[in-house]
Amino acid sequence: LPRPVAYGATVSTPEGIVCIGGNNSDSSLVEVSRISYNPTKGEVAVCALPPLPSPMDNLSAAFTGQEIYVAGGNENGQPCHTFLRLNLANIEKGWEQLPDFPGAARVQPVLAAGESPNGTRIYLAGGFQPILNEEEPIVPTDVLVFDPATFTWQQETVLPPFKDGTNRTLTGGCAVTFQTDKILFMGGVNYDCFLAAIARPIHLAKAEAARDSAAITRLQAEAKAYMHHPVEWYRFNTTLLQYDLSTKAWSDLGEYEQLARAGAGAVIQY
């Protein structure tokens, strides 16, 4: 890559892997690069594609046809509702601004494209909205869908809760399209553990304002211990979920310890 980068988005295309945005120790990035492999020469090449309109990180991306879609993350350092598209058959046009997705901002969401009975659709799930304007953070549990033909968003469904009734999130998880009309969702953080962590600063501020010494001590201790628990304590998602775009039905395909990751990537090899 042209320079060190993390927390960007990637998609696989017939011409290579496209790496989008991200950040490093200096700043968030607008750069978009395509990595391609020439099997005849045994060489890897990196070429630049049109940059993002603004620096973005912790975003998600999906590819369908000749188009790359990106959604969410941070834009210019702020949680956003941004939704963009790049047509690889007309890259001179650059990135196209599409309608913002509704509801909460989504940092570290997942995005996938698939074929519904009514045509191509783009599905957005997971992510979180951190504390904004002293308001409680939000971890969405719904799945949104975008119709490229009408340029409209709507709620598609909600993530199925766990067997004990607790909420599920795909924040930091993965989504990959399977057989064109199904999406596999996997990994990500635990809803309750993660929401408690990102809400802790605002709860601590309220405790300090109320001079609640017991709450202050407890919240400070929780914050200090958060990154030092045993792996099992974080309860990262191990379930492989399948969503059928034709029937709008969820299927639980089993529990796999290998899926208990946050911030990982996933691909399907046919």
Question: Can you say where each PLM-predicted feature lies in the sequence?
Answer:
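Kelch-like beta-propeller repeat domains
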Residues: 1-270
